[in-house]
Amino acid sequence: GETLLDVNGGSALTPASSNKVLTAWAALSVLGPDHTLTTKAVVSGGTVTLVGGGDVLLAADAGDPSATVGHAGLGDLARSTAEALKDKGVTSVSVALDDTLFTGPSWNSSWEDGNQAWVAPIQPIMLDVTAHSHSGAYPSDPAMEAAKAFSDQLTAAGVAVTGDVTRGAASSDASELASVESAPLADVLSVSLKTSDNTMTEVEGRLVAIDAHREATFEGATGAVLAQLGTDGFDTTGVTMLDCSGLALGDKVSSRLLAQIIARSAGADGGTVGRTLLTDLPVGALDGTLGDRFEGVGGAGTVRAKTGSLGTTASLTGTVVTKDGRQLAFAVIVDDFEDGGLTSARTAIDNDFVIPLADCGCSG
């Protein structure tokens, strides 16, 4: 689209959670909106292994096929597993966890101390991570928590489980007993973008890395996201991406790149990827992290945007529909203000930039 305003648009600044726009585009581009994540149980000898496939929204018991969070359930998986074991004449097993889909550290060294309240250890299987999001109460080992829940459900389904849950890659000769599928990626991204869930976004980045045959590490994920953006025609020169969620203060992205991704998404050449990305963003005065912004003013219901907030950074990246029906793509980053200035920065973005655009009859 036509550039109407560019003030320091090429400067690489700390994007905060607007960084999630980069990850979301890449994930939709390589995996597709309909992609689902498989959690399965396999057996070798007397050991049933729970294999994580990237679903961090699992229900502990029954899944809800009408929901995104808790779409797949470990109780359902355990009951199907118990039936398969019964068919084999097996009544007693040990249980193991295979969380080897992701490699490397589960904590990013670029994250400041105290951020444990904002992100879980990055592992490929978890019980509904949104139950803990932004609460400061993430489990220290969410994958093992999920495995123990599966083991308990297997016991409840009538299988005798011996010993504690162990950890290790499933045997190469293991055969599948049962599996459950997550909600489609488009729905999963809607949760992570609207609520700005850091854990989910880091997992999504690692899935991009796996698709690109890279290591499913922080470095592999950020490298894969940037590579896909380049493949899709975006100029990532000057970008520093230390994580996929935007939690790292060392992330540096230009507002120009963010706006270009949004403009592409809103245009005819954005395709299904772009339409899905825009649909998944929070809406002003309606939901997600914009639910309490733009209430009763221009922008209510007409702004779709990803928020970003860190101690000294605020950003907003998305679209606004003007009073005369024109859709504009924008990205604003306010960086390096003093501690305590976040509310003022957000207010300036809303009142001095976005709301005037929404109120504008400026199609000419």
Question: What is each PLM-predicted segment?
Answer:
Residues D6, A209-G364:
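Small-residue-rich helix-loop
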Residues G1-M144, L154-S190, K194-N198, I210:
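Active-site-adjacent loops and short helices of periplasmic peptidoglycan-processing enzymes
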Residues K40, T49, S94-A96, P124-M126, ...:
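Generic structural signal for residues positioned in beta-strands
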Residues A59-D61, S106, V203, L328, ...:
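Generic domain-boundary/flexible-linker signal
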